[in-house]
Amino acid sequence: ETHLQRAPGERRIYSNAGIEVAGQMLEEATGSPISRWIEESVSEPLGLASLEIEGSPAYSGRANAADLMLFARELAHPTLISTQLASSAQSIHFPELTGIVPGYGNYRPCPWGLGCEIKGDKNPHWTAPQSSVATFGHFGQAGSFLWVDPLSAERAVFVGERPFGQWHHDHWGPLNSQIVQAMRGQ
């Protein structure tokens, strides 16, 4: 049973439970286990040979950097979902909500899309300072990240060796800045 910390629409609180509920709803709608649905609907069409989800769709996914870049390309230029769904996923929902980005602090507002954080005006932030406010992505406790800037189609992934901590907080912004500079030939 899931306990709500706040009423929906009151405050943005990241929760694995929301992703797990979405996974359960997808299983009920399709009659297929979430891992099989992801394999057949995402992994196989995109050629993600290394992607494994053994357990919760909220935190048990594993893939190599090459496959994550293929997935990031899909997020930048969707082929598996409708343009309308892609636009909704990348759009801010409940734009006025205050919330916390784990490891980075409280933000007013704290924009999120459907399952992905949207950079907005957050500062400091784990993506590149020079990426657009529309940049969206996700990072996890495994110390890895994936982001896409839909305005420039720039994207990056990082596969970490150790759990998220102060090192990641201190280095991801500068690392992503260097990545963007390299993509722009600067």
Residue map of PLM features:
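Amphipathic, well-packed alpha-helical segments that form the structural scaffold of globular domains
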Residues: 1-4, 23, 73
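Active-site-proximal loop and beta-strand segments within enzyme catalytic domains
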Residues: 1-15, 32
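Glycine- and aromatic-rich loop/turn segments at beta-sheet edges
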Residues: 5-8, 49-55
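Catalytic loop of the DD-peptidase/beta-lactamase superfamily, centered on the K-T-G motif
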Residues: 10-11, 27-32, 36-44, 54-186
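Helix N-cap/beta->alpha junction signal
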Residues: 15-18, 64
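Short amphipathic alpha-helical face segments that pack within enzyme cores
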Residues: 17-24, 70
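Conserved N-terminal glycine/acidic-rich loop preference
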Residues: 21, 46, 50
